[in-house]
A protein has these predicted regions:
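Glycine/Thr-rich phosphate-binding loops that ligate phosphate moieties of nucleotide
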Residues: 1-199
Length: 199
């Protein structure tokens, strides 16, 4: 997945531990002083750009710092997820909360950043094995649908997924507005890349 690839490659090239990556990213301002990462290290799935490559854009002699690169890696990956959320919204899906899973979900900074970029509350499940839990819930849903006439996935998740309330992050108005502008710029850059690859 590109989400952790972006931060792991940035962390590795800078020779940082995960803790140091978070500390450096925390000390950079929202927007990484103008640096945006298009995090397509392995192409991209949404939008479908399998041949796309990653790019750090907006670099200058004054903003090219480890702190800004770390934050831009986190922001770029999360802005990519926001694009996927917008695709879902265009299909009529309107979430009122984001449940963040995986290694990044352990980072308080990343949860807060995700909340501000999505402009929605973000929380993580108590279970760290989200993939296995999701597979088990899907299997249970299939079984109940076949044997007992159906079940609601929402009811199953409400019954079997516990949330870590201490992990909840809420978006601030000022931060959400800043990230809305950054997301618009990110989307414009992504579309230019898409056009150049398609043509």
């Amino acid at each position: 997945m590109n989400v952790t690839v972006a931060t792991e490659l940035t962390r590795a090239v800078l020779g940082l531990s995960l803790k140091e990556l978070n500390e450096k990213a925390s000390s950079a301002p929202i927007g990484s002083e103008g640096i945006i990462l298009l995090p397509y290290f392995n192409g991209e799935r949404t939008p479908p750009l399998p041949n796309a490559t990653a790019s750090f854009l907006g670099l200058s002699s004054t903003n090219y710092t480890p702190e800004n690169l770390c934050r831009a890696a986190m922001e770029g990956a999360t802005l990519g997820l926001r694009y996927g959320l917008d695709v879902l919204k265009a299909q009529g899906i309107e979430p009122d909360e984001i449940r963040l899973v995986g290694g990044g979900a352990k980072s308080r900074l990343w949860r807060q950043m995700a909340s501000e970029i999505f402009d929605l509350p973000v929380i993580r499940p108590k279970s760290e094995e989200a993939g296995a839990m999701g597979a088990a819930l899907q299997a249970m849903w299939c079984y109940l649908t076949e044997k007992e006439g159906g079940a609601s996935l929402k009811e199953l998740t409400n019954d079997f997924v516990s949330l870590d309330e201490d992990s909840r992050a809420l978006s601030g108005i000022s931060e959400a507005i800043q990230y809305a502008d950054i997301y618009q710029h990110y989307t414009q850059l992504k579309e230019k890349l898409w056009d150049s690859i398609e043509n």
